[in-house]
Structure formats: structure tokens, C-alpha cells
């Protein structure tokens, strides 16, 4: 069963080849057997999953249901879920259970999806390797001494290891696309505002965006159909009609203009990555696409800009965790100040503290203009680069990550090297554009991801390009040994 894609599983459920309960039990057994070593799940909701599966079977038996009714899924542990704890990978929320479901969770539940559990992640989504989690590092299924990427590393590893057909993720600077690339799956970051952020614990509110992580573009399209749409409870949600993303999957890509930024193919790119990426681009050329060279001149400013804007927003968002209302509270504080200091000092991990300190510094009275205001101006320039480029081409392509998955612990003591792992993804978030990563080959036996970036609300085109590529390649069907 676990070798089938989400779309294939949905067809099999409709044809009564097996029940949702049988399918759910199959995945729960795989999680029980394989997760202890992989560490991709923080919480497995066995009883609730089987209860939801039985309800889905009743709907399917009546001939009703959506395109994903009865399909087991996993949620990144950043989405609030009633009855199941939401930790955000942090000691601060180790015992927190939300009183409501995130919009993404409720929409998928209403559509009949079954929640297997909550996946591991970098603490408060801050990290590129899934090593900052309070619950320990996630291992890459392709090589257990390598990182799965972050911050949605648990979701990516679980999908790659076939512990779940698909999962939800969030992307603030590459946190869906980078782990998707490193684990050899498909991951889509929608346009900012396309998917509701209600109930998604905030890191950097102007950058955060939820999206699907799955084996194929078709699977991602099926999930996005349900996840996308306006939500009045999210002030940044966009009131724009949601198309059926599956309808455009089979369209011809002949004549589509693909731009290759010169800045994405410079000396920073690992040679092992360049070879499969160039081969993938040639495949698109064979499918009828036109390839053009373009420039995104402010690419090198993206990382420093992001690491002013994101920590500033993080500092503001995480100020709510003070030990007085919810979350971790220190024992026996002497006074209110000690309650604040010790609760935050003991509840947050080192990377989260680092970003809070950076954010507080750049927002301080003496440095606001020098750092934060300047970063917002640079953000506009980065966005303008994309705006200009996308008047010349339909989509932009390049590598998702400059290197394959690196070793666990390799960059833990070098935060700048870790931050540079997102050099090709961060600028997309700063501009609010949609982008996806698809498997495009291997380097040193490890997966390589191809990133496709589009204009605002062009998810249909991105999924169409990805699907057509996956029809003529089999990288997305490769499975790690032992899984």
C-alpha cells in the first residue's frame, strides 16, 4: 500500500480495494516499526486516527466523500490540533494542547483526511536541518547520518520513508522546499495569503506560509485544492477564487518560457548539484519549453535581509511566551521578573534565543533605521527583481539547495553556514511568490531538488510543469533502502 501515491490510494479507496481503516493501520504499523530510528513524528495519534478512518469508511461506503476522503496524513507540529498536543518542537510548548484546530487542519479533516499524528520540526520553525528540535534531530531516510532539512524535516522524512502518503508543512524561508529537496519529495510553498495562517503558530508573520508535502505534483495539487482559500480569521488571507489545481496538470508546456538566473548557477553551487539540475532543464527543453538566461541581481542580499526581517518579527511574536498564560513556566520564581527570565531562558533553545536577540537588537531605538528599515527597502528591491524577470519569462528555475543533505552536526556550530543553506529559497518568501521543489536526480547518492518559481497565484502552472516532468522521469518514485 505504501508504494502507491496519494492519488493512487484515493482511487483504490473509491474502488473498495481496501478500507481507510486498513490503510491507516498499515501506516500506523510502519510508524511504530520505523519511526524510533527516524524520529520524524513527535506525536502519533493512533486512537484518533482509527476513529477518523472508520468515519471516512462510512462516508465512502455511501458513495460520497471528497478526493482525499480516507487518506492518512501527518501535520507539522506547528498547526494547532484539538485533543493532540502542539509543541512547535519546543520545550516551551511541550504540554500545550490547543483549544481549536488550525484552518488547514480543519479543512483537511472536513474533507475526510485522517490525521496520523504530528511531525517533528526545528524549534518554532527556526532552522534548516531539523536539529534544533527539543525532541531530537530527525534523520534523513536516504542516509541516517545526514539531515533531512528544515524546518519541516519531520514531514519530509516521513513522506520520503513512506510513513505517510503526504504531510503539511510551513515555509518561512525555504522550510517546505529545502527539506523536500534533501529528502527527494515534492513540496509546494504557495503564494503568501493563498493558505490560511490561522492556527499556525507564528514565526515571522509576513513570511510564513503553509503548504503540501507529498510524493508527486498530482498529490500536492489534490491537497492544495482543500488547503487553499480565503479565511476571514487570517487578516493576510487573500480573497481569490481557488481553481481545481488538478485540471491543468496535463496541459502542454510547449512554448513556456523558463528563466535561469545567472546568480543561481555561480561558484556557490555544488558541482554535484549542477549536473542533475542542468539535465532536468534539458528535459523541460525536450518537452517544448524555451530556456532563457535572466538576472536576479539582488540575490546575494536575500540572506542578510531575511535575517533582519525574520528575527525582528520572531522577537515580537515570541514575546507572548512569558510563563504567565500558557506554555512552560519555571518552578518557584522569586518574583515576576524572575518568572519571565527563567521561563523564557529555560523554555527556549539556543537558536530561538539567538534569533530573538537579533530581532530585539535590530528593532531597538538606536538601530531600527540602520537595520530593520534598510532591510525592508532591500526586500522591495528583491521583489522588484522578480517582478522584472517575470515580465520576460513565465517561470524561473534553479536548484533548491546549493548542496545535498549535509551531515548531522556539520553546521551546528556555524549559524552563518546554516543560514546560507537557504540562499536559493529565502528571496521567494521575501517576495511572497509561489515556488515548489521536485526531485531531479541524485548527487553522492543523495536527492537533488529542482526549484520552480512562478508569479503570484500561478500554482496551477508550477504544478503543471512539475507533473509533466514527473511523467517522463522517475526520480519521485525512488525510495530509500530499507523503507
UniProtKB/Swiss-Prot annotation:
Q: What GO cellular-component annotations does this UniProt entry give?
A: glutamyl-tRNA(Gln) amidotransferase complex
Name the active site residues: 76, 151, 175
Record's family? Belongs to the amidase family. GatA subfamily.
The molecular function terms of the Gene Ontology recorded here are:
ATP binding; glutaminyl-tRNA synthase (glutamine-hydrolyzing) activity
User: Which InterPro entries does this UniProt record tie to the protein?
Assistant: Amidase, Amidase_CS, Amidase_dom, AS_sf, GatA
A Gene Ontology BP annotation from the UniProt entry = translation
Name residues in a coiled coil.
Answer: none
The gene behind this protein is: gatA
Establish whether keyword ATP-binding is in the entry.
yes
Source species of the chain: Nitrosococcus oceani (strain ATCC 19707 / BCRC 17464 / JCM 30415 / NCIMB 11848 / C-107)
Q: What is this protein called?
A: Glutamyl-tRNA(Gln) amidotransferase subunit A
Amino acid at each position: 500500500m505504501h508504494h502507491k501515491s496519494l492519488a493512487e490510494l484515493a482511487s483504490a479507496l473509491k474502488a473498495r480495494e481496501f478500507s481507510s481503516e486498513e490503510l491507516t493501520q498499515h501506516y500506523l504499523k510502519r510508524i511504530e516499526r520505523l519511526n524510533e530510528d527516524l524520529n520524524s513524528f513527535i506525536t502519533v495519534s493512533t486512537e484518533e486516527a482509527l476513529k477518523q478512518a472508520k468515519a471516512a469508511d462510512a462516508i465512502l461506503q455511501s458513495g460520497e466523500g471528497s478526493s482525499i476522503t480516507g487518506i492518512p496524513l501527518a501535520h507539522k507540529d506547528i498547526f494547532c490540533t484539538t485533543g493532540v498536543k502542539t509543541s512547535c518542537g519546543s520545550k516551551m510548548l511541550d504540554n500545550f494542547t490547543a483549544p481549536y484546530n488550525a484552518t488547514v487542519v480543519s479543512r483537511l479533516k472536513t474533507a475526510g483526511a485522517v490525521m496520523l499524528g504530528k511531525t517533528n520540526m526545528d524549534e518554532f520553525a527556526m532552522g534548516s536541518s531539523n536539529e534544533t528540535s527539543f525532541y531530537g534531530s530527525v534523520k534523513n531516510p536516504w542516509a541516517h547520518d545526514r539531515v533531512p532539512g528544515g524546518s519541516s524535516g519531520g514531514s519530509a522524512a516521513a513522506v520520503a520513508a513512506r510513513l505517510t502518503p503526504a504531510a503539511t508543512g510551513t515555509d518561512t524561508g525555504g522550510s517546505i522546499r529545502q527539506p523536500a529537496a534533501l529528502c527527494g519529495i515534492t513540496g509546494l510553498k504557495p503564494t503568501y495569503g493563498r493558505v490560511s495562517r490561522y492556527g499556525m503558530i507564528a514565526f515571522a508573520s509576513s513570511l510564513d506560509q503553509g503548504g503540501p508535502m507529498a510524493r508527486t505534483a498530482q498529490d500536492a495539487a489534490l491537497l492544495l485544492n482543500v488547503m487553499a482559500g480565503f479565511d476571514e480569521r487570517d487578516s493576510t488571507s487573500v480573497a481569490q477564487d481557488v481553481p481545481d489545481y488538478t485540471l491543468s496538470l496535463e496541459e502542454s508546456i510547449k512554448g513556456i518560457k523558463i528563466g535561469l538566473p545567472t546568480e543561481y548557477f555561480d561558484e556557490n553551487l555544488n558541482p554535484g548539484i549542477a549536473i542533475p539540475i542542468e539535465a532536468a532543464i534539458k528535459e523541460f527543453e525536450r518537452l517544448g519549453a524555451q530556456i532563457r538566461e535572466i538576472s536576479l541581481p539582488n540575490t546575494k542580499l536575500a540572506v542578510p535581509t531575511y535575517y533582519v526581517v525574520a528575527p525582528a518579527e520572531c522577537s515580537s511574536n515570541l514575546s507572548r511566551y512569558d510563563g504567565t498564560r500558557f506554555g512552560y513556566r519555571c518552578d518557584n520564581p522569586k518574583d515576576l521578573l524572575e518568572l519571565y527570565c527563567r521561563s523564557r531562558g529555560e523554555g527556549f533553545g539556543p537558536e530561538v534565543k539567538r534569533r530573538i536577540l537579533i530581532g530585539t537588537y535590530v528593532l531597538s531605538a538606536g538601530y531600527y533605521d540602520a537595520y530593520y528599515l534598510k532591510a525592508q527597502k532591500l526586500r522591495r528591491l528583491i521583489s522588484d527583481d522578480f517582478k522584472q524577470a517575470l515580465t520576460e519569462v513565465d517561470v524561473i528555475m534553479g536548484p533548491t539547495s546549493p548542496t545535498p543533505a549535509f551531515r548531522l552536526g556539520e553546521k551546528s556550530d556555524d549559524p552563518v553556514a546554516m543560514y546560507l543553506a537557504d540562499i536559493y529559497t529565502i528571496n521567494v518568501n521575501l517576495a511572497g511568490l509561489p515556488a515548489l521543489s521536485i526531485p531531479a536526480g541524485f548527487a553522492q547518492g543523495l536527492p537533488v531538488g529542482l526549484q520552480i518559481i512562478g508569479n503570484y497565484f500561478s500554482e496551477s502552472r508550477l504544478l503543471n510543469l512539475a507533473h509533466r516532468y514527473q511523467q517522463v522521469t522517475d526520480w519521485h518514485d525512488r525510495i530509500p533502502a530499507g523503507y
